[in-house]
Amino acid sequence: MRMTTRRGSGRRRAVPRWLMAALALATLAGCGVSTVDEVRVAWPPFKDGTALVLPSDPAQCPDLSGTYRVAGEPRAGEAAAGVGDLRRFLAYTLDLPGLPDTAEHAWRPTPAASVTFNAAPQGWQVVADDGQGGRFTGLLPLRDATAGVDRPADGPLAALPGVQHFGGCTQGRFWISARRDWRQYESMGVFRTVALLRPQAGGLLVSVQRESHSIGLLPWYSSDEVRSQYWFGPERASR
């Protein structure tokens, strides 16, 4: 995109490159407010690395314990492969440690594949079973369950380099946010995700909003937003 401005003489003149960059950075610093599963989400400016954190109260935590089918049923928003598969969502959209494939251990799902949530002192232990002996274990953490852990309260979880996680409970929902920053040559950007999980009709309802922003030196700026909601039925219903 090429921006132009007019001088008093009426001649068109290209806007200086530095001004284009400043305009792009101003856009990049923007923030907004959205609603995800009836919960207000205030997105902070992301250029300065601020994490997305919602209010949290342990008394408002839902019980996510249960075993759920891997394949979800769309309920609202856009279809998204990264959300409609529960194990893929946890492993790659949220980048939870312990759940992605490794060189020694690959996910080979069968129709019996499932994901189990078990209550744990620090949140919910997640066990993904591909139905033929392959098991991956991770943790959906409670933000308030950081006592005794060598990190600041409300701090990000140990995860992949460049990935931040925060989690907690509000309005009967468990929320988790993930932020991944990237840089390549003269370009930089960020992926941000917030997800709210709650039990519904014996299954698990997952509501997600994802944002991506990138900026380069042309200068150019791009952004994208996807909202999805999927319901994952109880594993027993598939038998």
Which sequence ranges carry the predicted segments?
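Sec-dependent bacterial lipoprotein signal peptides
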Residues: 1-31
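Amphipathic/hydrophobic helical signal segments and adjacent flexible N-terminal regions
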Residues: 31-121, 177-179, 200-239
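A short, structured loop/turn motif at beta-sheet edges
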Residues: 65, 165-171, 196-204
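Predominantly extracellular/secreted and cell-surface proteins with exposed
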Residues: 105-184
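Phosphate/adenylate-binding glycine loop and adjacent helical scaffold
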Residues: 188-195
